[in-house]
Amino acid sequence: AKDKEKKEKKDKKKDDAPAEEAPAAAAAPAEEAAPTPSAAPIHKVGNVFALFKQNQIQEFKEAFTMIDQDRDGIIGPDDLGNIFQQIGREVDPKVVKEMLAESAEKLNFTHFLTLFGEKLHGTDTEGTLRDAFALFDEDKLGYLLEEYVKDLLTNVGDQYNKDEIKQVWKEAPIEGGKFDYVKFVRLIKRGKEEE
């Protein structure tokens, strides 16, 4: 009975440990502390690994590795085409490229997990968020004036207080009074390391 209690305590500690990012390489991640599951959307978390339990991340990693047949850490058109052939489906290479186009860059493990996180947790895609900011960018410059964004946040829709704005502004890409919403969306969707 005591051994069972010790194991339960050990498992509980693992569940409470902070998430560590799994490597983007094809090898399975080393033993890591299990992330705390969260219902928070990716754009609030900034780290897709925090959305899943460790065993779920491992399952996604195994699926990624199975698809990444050339073991280069990237799922490319050839990898995806080969998987379709293995399951007996002939798919036009153009269709495969379109499927991969949803990922703005090369589809490494982090992006692969992000796509699943968006689908499973119902968060908006990078493009959707970027387009929402672009609605306010009438001149299509890729940035908004800092004071204009602050005014929108305090007076329109869900109104934010000064402390909430200060929190957002800590990480916001602002230079010379210009809020770069393209970089901001990338930051909230992929995290700081992939700016």
From Swiss-Prot:
Top-level lineage group: Eukaryota
UniProt keyword terms in alphabetical order: Calcium, Metal-binding, Motor protein, Muscle protein, Myosin, Repeat
Keyword field contains Metal-binding: yes
Domain EF-hand intervals: 55-90, 124-159
Pfam families to which the protein is assigned, alphabetical: EF-hand_6
Region (Disordered): 1-39
SMART domains to which the protein is assigned, alphabetical: EFh (SM00054)
UniProt keyword annotation of Calcium present: yes
Biased composition (Basic and acidic residues): 1-17
InterPro entries hit by this protein: EF-hand-dom_pair, EF_Hand_1_Ca_BS, EF_hand_dom, Myosin_RLC
Ranges of biased composition (kind: Low complexity): 20-39
GO cellular component: myosin complex
Disulfide partners: none
GO molecular function, one term: calcium ion binding
SUPFAM superfamilies given in the database record: EF-hand (SSF47473)
Sequence positions that bind Ca(2+): D68, D70, D72, D79
Other facts noted in the record for this chain: This chain binds calcium.
Entry function: Plays an important role in regulation of muscle cell contractile activity.
Record text on subunit structure and interactions: Myosin is a hexamer of 2 heavy chains and 4 light chains.
UniProt protein name: Myosin regulatory light chain, striated muscle, 25 kDa isoform
Organism: Lumbricus terrestris (Common earthworm)
